[in-house]
Amino acid sequence: MSKPGGHARHGRRDGIDPVLRSRARRRALQAVYAWQIAGGFAKQVIAQFAHEQAHEVADLAYFESLVEGVLSNRSELDTALTPYLDRGVEEVDAIERAVLRLAAYELLYRQDVPYRVVINEAIETAKRFGSEHGHTYVNGVLDRAAVEWRKMESGASGA
């Protein structure tokens, strides 16, 4: 998986493959969405989707950390998102709600992931799976939230 000279795939020195991370995020979205609809325990949801994911190359460890993180911190994530929403969390479309929870988890708990990556991934995922204009809603919420949640990072870049 590494290129000559020790560089990871796609030229990343940190060994993180952005394609595999994107796939992990998409699978995590599906798992969080299923959990929102059917409920269940984090380990059950992870086990179900990890088994299905075995047929698709993705960052399984990242998938598991996202799903576990969102499910175990749902209340805190919803509280953090609330000031940036124009309606109650449960009133947000289920796909957009899952996208927002995943992105909120990454923005708040995964400081190693640049906020622009989190927002761009969330927008692309909302475009792919959400309602026609869901991605614009997701973008607006996350842009406002990132200014507060990632002050140092967003302030330094002029966002």
Swiss-Prot record:
GO terms for molecular function: RNA binding. The keyword Transcription applies. The keyword Chaperone does not apply. HAMAP family: NusB (MF_00073). Coiled coil: none annotated. It holds the Pfam family NusB. GO terms for cellular component: cytosol. Keywords: RNA-binding, Transcription, Transcription antitermination, Transcription regulation. Gene3D superfamilies: NusB-like (1.10.940.10). Belongs to the NusB family. Involved in transcription antitermination. Required for transcription of ribosomal RNA (rRNA) genes. Binds specifically to the boxA antiterminator sequence of the ribosomal RNA (rrn) operons. This is Transcription antitermination protein NusB. GO terms for biological process: DNA-templated transcription termination; transcription antitermination. NCBIfam families: nusB (TIGR01951). InterPro entries: NusB-like_sf (IPR035926), NusB_fam (IPR011605), NusB_RsmB_TIM44 (IPR006027).
